[in-house]
UniProtKB/Swiss-Prot annotation:
UniProt KW Cytoplasm keyword: yes
Name the record gives this protein: Spindle pole body component SPC42
Gene, per the UniProt record: SPC42
Coiled-coil segments: 62-136, 248-297
Job of this protein: Forms a polymeric layer at the periphery of the spindle pole body (SPB) central plaque which has an essential function during SPB duplication and may facilitate attachment of the SPB to the nuclear membrane.
Length: 363
């Protein structure tokens, strides 16, 4: 230890390079080392020579095994995560598959029911057609053969009695008339049932075709404005005809209908505005025409009054001056001509008089 009170004052800057010399342990002593791996100076002795090679191999093998174990654990975690994700996907797919299986079963049942109904309706239709043909074209009976049983006694002849004209007709003819009326009523009833059945079959076939066909877009369901002028509108898609329409179909159909109605309203508004403009224009033109007609009628009346009341002898216009040679617009044609003839020839002025300087009166 330096005993100087100010050791740095007398030390140079270059001495700082050797300050570490005083920090060397055991500089002034030589203690016995506590560990065999270190020498007297304190440096580590090469201990690899002392460790046998078997221990070295064992440590290397253990280190490799630990590293492999870590890598395998990492791969195992990744595989477990993948398996978890695949299980989730499999559950969702299973639920969707069950849903679609239920839907297909329902559709198959509906199809079977519809086929059964169609077969029953076809049977009824065929039966109705056969009965209709039988009623319309009955079997023609032999007119010579009588319905009543012929009596075996040929000697007896049934002679009709003479009846009064007021008596009732032949009951056989009345029965025939009643039978024909009954047949006509039955034929009408059968025709009604046939029409109902055919309409029902056609509707069911249209429903099946709509179910098999893809859903049209709402833009295709909207008829353009130019086509609406035609009286025969095209057949629009109506999902309500279906047996079980979905909510999306109904919403699409309603939105398309709303859009079509809005377009029709806008078209009607435009037509109404154009009609109002035409009406206003017509009123204004009629008013102008009436005003012009009234003005023309008033001018004609004024001219007639002036012609009837005009006196050429006593007439004098404001335009009858010495400087006005043109006929006045207010004067009549004769007066204006007379005025022009009077003022046409003027006396010539003397040049000396024109260029002479005027003399004042009070000179």
């Amino acid at each position: 230890m330096n005993g100087s009170p100010t050791p740095k004052r007398y030390s140079s800057k270059s001495s700082r390079l050797y300050d570490d010399y005083y920090n060397i342990p055991y500089q002034y002593s030589n203690p016995t080392p506590m560990n065999r791996d270190y020498n007297d100076v304190g440096s580590r002795i090469n201990a690899d020579k002392l460790v046998p090679e078997e221990y070295k191999r064992n440590t290397e093998f253990i280190n490799k095994a630990v590293q492999q174990n870590k890598e395998l654990n990492f791969k195992l975690r990744e595989k477990q995560n993948e398996i978890f994700e695949l299980k989730k996907i499999a559950e969702t797919l299973r639920s969707k598959l069950e849903k679609y299986v239920d839907i297909t079963k329902k559709l198959e049942n509906q199809n079977l029911n519809l086929q059964i109904k169609i077969s029953d309706l076809e049977k009824k239709l065929s039966d109705a057609n056969s009965t209709f043909k039988e009623m319309r074209f009955p079997k023609v009976k032999d007119p010579m053969v009588d319905d009543d049983p012929v009596s075996e006694n040929y000697d007896q002849i049934n002679v009709p009695k003479h009846r009064a004209p007021d008596a009732t007709g032949n009951p056989r003819t009345t029965n025939k008339v009643s039978n024909t009326s009954d047949q006509d009523s039955r034929l009408k009833a059968i025709e009604r049932t046939l029409s109902v059945l055919t309409n029902y079959v056609m509707r069911s076939e249209d429903g099946n075709n709509d179910r098999m066909s893809p859903l049209p877009s709402p833009l295709n369901t909207i008829s353009p404005i130019n086509n609406r002028l035609n009286f025969q509108e095209p057949k629009r898609y109506n999902p309500t005809v279906k047996v079980n329409p979905s909510d999306d179909d109904i919403m699409m159909y309603e939105s398309a209908e709303l859009k079509r109605v809005e377009e029709e309203i806008e078209e009607l508004k435009r037509k109404i505005l154009v009609r109002k403009k035409h009406d206003l224009r017509k009123l204004s033109l009629n008013n102008q025409l009436q005003e012009l007609q009234s003005m023309m009628d008033g001018d004609d009346n004024i001219k007639l009054d002036n012609v009837s009341k005009h006196n050429h002898a006593t007439h004098r216009h404001s335009s009858q001056s010495s400087r006005d040679y043109s006929p006045s617009s207010d004067a009549c044609l004769e007066c204006s001509n007379d005025l022009y003839e009077k003022n046409r020839v003027k006396p010539e002025n003397n040049m000396s008089e024109t260029f002479a300087t005027p003399t004042p009166n009070n000179r």
